[in-house]
UniProtKB/Swiss-Prot annotation:
Naturally occurring in which organism (per UniProt): Mycoplasmopsis synoviae (strain 53)
Chain's gene name: rplU
Classification via Pfam families: Ribosomal_L21p
Protein name: Large ribosomal subunit protein bL21
Family: Belongs to the bacterial ribosomal protein bL21 family.
Keyword hit for Ribosomal protein: yes
A Gene Ontology molecular function term of the record: rRNA binding
Quaternary structure (record): Part of the 50S ribosomal subunit. Contacts protein L20.
GO annotations of cellular component type: cytoplasm; ribonucleoprotein complex; ribosome
Amino acid sequence: MFAIIETGGKQILVKEGDSIYVEKLEGQEKSEVKFDKVLAVNDVFGKPYVTGAVVHGTIEKQGKAKKIVVYRHNPKSTHKRKLGHRQPYTLVKITKIKGK
């Protein structure tokens, strides 16, 4: 059984037992999460969401991605700027897909 869920502005294809990286979700590790914005379950497609469909998961890890370095330099002056950014993420293991 598979489903397409929407979380963090992205659409993700999931199956039971999959581990997925999503944008940061509130919650502690080992806590349960529910995704109710389900776009499709097997061959049932919603308009825009499938009513009554829920995907259950468990938060495995809260973390940050690798650092991305942004460097700006204006060659006509001495202005230089170096920034770093680490995007927070949540690792979720899909435990159950409940469809229609």
